[in-house]
Amino acid sequence: MNRLPEIFPVLVLAFCGLTTACATSSQPVDPYVQKLQWLDAADPQADANQAVKKNDLRLLGLATRSVNIPGISKADTLKYEEHCGVQLIEGISDVVRSDEHLRLMQKARSYALKYNAIIKSQCKP
């Protein structure tokens, strides 16, 4: 009772599936994109409310050519930086590395605007 002829097609398919999966996953992910992927599942309102509960009133900033704090005017940036503090979102750059990086940087800006609106209501210079 040799079962090899019955199992052989299954083994071949499994081997092909494993080698294909390995081949497609070998492409490196841009580290800037990797640092921003959390934004796809993030909830800025919930995250900001959690930060307020922990008394972490730092605003979120974007490090491009200079630090930009979404929702804060350039004139007020220094006051808010000194009084509330700023936490930079990692993965932001003044160089767009790919379409995916651009999409995530735009999402980071939108996230920071919503997050900072809540924090700003709690931290006034």
Give the ranges of each region predicted by the language model.
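Bacterial N-terminal signal peptides that target proteins for export
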Residues: M1-L11
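C-terminal motif of bacterial Sec signal peptides marking the signal peptidase cleavage site
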Residues: L18-A21
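Bacterial signal peptide processing site
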Residues: A23-S25
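Post-signal/leader-peptide non-cytosolic segments of secretory proteins
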Residues: Q27-P125
